């Protein structure tokens, strides 16, 4: 760094350029021996055609041409171009509007179908909820009947034992849960 800032020896040309551009060169880079003509990116760039401005003489940075005669566009052709472009945009807008209207119509149809299906499913769910409630009541009754049956099964032997302890004249008929028709047959 001392050679760049305050050395009395003459600096190298690269360092002079760097000093003039306020760039400090720390180490010179290595030059690659790359063949640019075979680079695919360069080949693609070379294949791009060059374009000229519509109004020659008004290139970037020029505010007013001095001695050159400007080429002017024919206003009738520009008007035709603009009208054609306007017609094209109008056709595109009509196509988009037609497609949008078709989509809106289809969305409304789908909304109606979904709403109908949703209300049908809600009614079905309510019906199944009622069925589930009735099944729950049946399950509760079944549990109550099982408890009653267990109570009877425990009570009948005690009744028979108590009945057998009574004198024969005071004994009751044997207890049966079956209806009279089943006993007689």
UniProtKB/Swiss-Prot annotation:
<keyword id="KW-0458">Lysosome</keyword>
<dbReference type="GO" id="GO:0098574">
    <property type="term" value="C:cytoplasmic side of lysosomal membrane"/>
</dbReference>
<protein>
    <recommendedName>
        <fullName>BLOC-1-related complex subunit 5</fullName>
    </recommendedName>
</protein>
<dbReference type="Pfam" id="PF10158">
    <property type="entry name" value="LOH1CR12"/>
</dbReference>
<comment type="similarity">
    <text>Belongs to the BORCS5 family.</text>
</comment>
<dbReference type="GO" id="GO:1903744">
    <property type="term" value="P:positive regulation of anterograde synaptic vesicle transport"/>
</dbReference>
<comment type="function">
    <text>As part of a BORC-like complex may play a role in lysosomes movement and localization at the cell periphery. Associated with the cytosolic face of lysosomes, this complex may couple lysosomes to microtubule plus-end-directed kinesin motor.</text>
</comment>
<dbReference type="GO" id="GO:0072384">
    <property type="term" value="P:organelle transport along microtubule"/>
</dbReference>
<dbReference type="InterPro" id="IPR018780">
    <property type="entry name" value="TBORCS5"/>
</dbReference>
<dbReference type="GO" id="GO:0030672">
    <property type="term" value="C:synaptic vesicle membrane"/>
</dbReference>
<dbReference type="GO" id="GO:0099078">
    <property type="term" value="C:BORC complex"/>
</dbReference>
<keyword id="KW-0449">Lipoprotein</keyword>
<feature type="region of interest" description="Disordered">
    <location>
        <begin position="1"/>
        <end position="20"/>
    </location>
</feature>
<keyword id="KW-0472">Membrane</keyword>
<dbReference type="GO" id="GO:0016020">
    <property type="term" value="C:membrane"/>
</dbReference>
<dbReference type="GO" id="GO:0032418">
    <property type="term" value="P:lysosome localization"/>
</dbReference>
